[in-house]
Amino acid sequence: MFRQRTRVLFLISAMLAIGLPVHSATPASGTLSGIANPVNWSGGPYTAVATDTSSCTTLNCDTFFLNINTSAGFFTTNSNDEVQIRITWQGVTNEFDLYLFDPSGNLLASSVQSFETFEEIDAGPLPNGTYKLVIVASQTVNVSYSGTAQIAADPTVANGKARYQPGKMTFGTPFELPRPNDPANTVTTLVFDQDVEPRVVHDSLGNLYVAAIQGVPGGVDVWKSYDSGKSFTYLGQPDGTQVLATTGLTTGTGLGGGDEDLAVGTSGNVYMNSLWLGSTTQASSFNGGSTWIVNPLSSDIPADDRQWIASYGNNTLYLTYKQLGTLLNGTVSIVVVKSTDGGITFPQITQVTTPVSGVQPGDQGNIVVDPRNGNVYTVFFDQTSTQVYIARSTDGGVTFDLKLVYQGPADTSLAHVFPAIAADEGSNLHIVFSDGVNTYLTTSQDLGATWSHVVRVNNGASTRTAIQPWVVAGDSGKVDITWLGSSSTNFLDSSAQWQVFMAQSQNGLASVPTFAQSTVTGVIHVGPVCVNGLGCPSGTRTLAEYWAPDVYLDGNALIVYPDDKNSGLASGAARTWFVRQTAGPTIILTVQ
């Protein structure tokens, strides 16, 4: 597909050089007054390239004026009806984008996607007035489009539709989390100079904790904020405690740092787990990170990968990981172990996937515990990376049942990179994942028994590609979804410019959810982002594979992410940066 796009761009450039006629929508306007009167128009043919509405000329954009003129109280009487707008064209290598502006000229909604032959806006019940539709020929060769606007019933069952609006969330100035320049924590090689795959969590007092990996055996760096994220104090490497006796260093270098995860208990216990070559190291602090008790063999079984932890109550901690074949003679399986003493020991061991279950796991996402009922959930792909599964336990992790959440196309990989799951305050579940082009959301309102139709989350010319998604849940049906986005349609594009994005949904359980999207950062990386783990070519995996945000006590988003563009390291390594939401809607309406 990328080679096809390159040929298309070459052809567009050649045709633009000889000059093209100006086109306009036919007709130029239309009126919707009721359900039985759809409006149709068309435009083109276009051979053009355009970024978005800011680059519009008469050669690459079309304008259609839509008049809404319904009777008084029409949408009150017809409460399930909405304005639906759709454009279609031929050929997935062509791209048109669709923008809707209100009578005052403000961007109201848009539909911008890639590798499709349509754009669609579900605009909701619009007040009477004249609205402007802008159709952008973002990448087209001698192709026309057809448009339709109608008033029709809102779907009562989720069918993949969503509404996309500009976000009103604003964010502060991002800053890097520094670490001391001492021999214990700064090594001159790329592997150890980095701090990637960060996670941020908070406790009930408002303290923030951040952890990020240097890479095996560089260890895990941990920071704490006492002032709601205005500043951070470096706490050292909790997994370094296990080698203090042999190194004689005051802070201690880590033995792990392959992967990490971070969690807090209800009374403030802090848990950090670090992957090393033999097992995982569980570091637990019962005094706010001042000191740590360390178990370097917390997985109980050797040969592990990509571990995750989740706390429940004050002293219960679940640890899950992908076991690489020790148990089943080379067969990969998912294991969950449980501690009831704050991570000091893990006596309960449960094998989640077995050959009998008929599911061979691929990449595994995070583990969560619903604090309202104690149910335990983890999410994973199958070995082909075309299926999404959850594993659910309703008996404290003793047994798990598996449920297929989503079956993707046979020729599409969903491993870009980990799926992520969250439980909201209503015990609803939310899963996000990426197919390398878009980030998708699916939800469950019955404890994981059934799942909604997947819906695209990212929207807009600046994020035609969306990878490395994560989801954080708040009140019932309310979620923040973050991802790494680029205007390029190929995540291996050597010139792609990547930014952090966040979409918020206040009605994630609706048949047509609404996503309000904001850009969180400037450019944090230029070039390809490989998602093939250790199989990636050199220099394409500097951002590693994930970053996990949080939502604070006041409902504002807390976001940590890797950045190799603004850190300024001579090695080109990425460091961990932090940014906090400063204004706008939140997913927790009742401040804790």
Spans of features found by a protein language model:
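Bacterial N-terminal signal peptides that target proteins for export
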Residues: 1-10
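Bacterial N-terminal signal peptides
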Residues: 10-19
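Sec/Tat signal peptide C-region and signal peptidase I cleavage site
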Residues: 20-24
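Cleaved targeting-peptide boundary
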Residues: 25-31
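C-terminal PAP-associated
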Residues: 32-80, 90, 152-592
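Short beta-strand/loop motifs in extracellular/secreted proteins, especially
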Residues: 81-83, 94-98, 141-145, 220
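Short solvent-exposed strand-capping/beta-turn motif centered on an Asx-Ser/Thr pair
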Residues: 88-92, 138-140
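Noncatalytic accessory or regulatory domains flanking protease catalytic cores in secreted, cell-surface
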Residues: 99-148
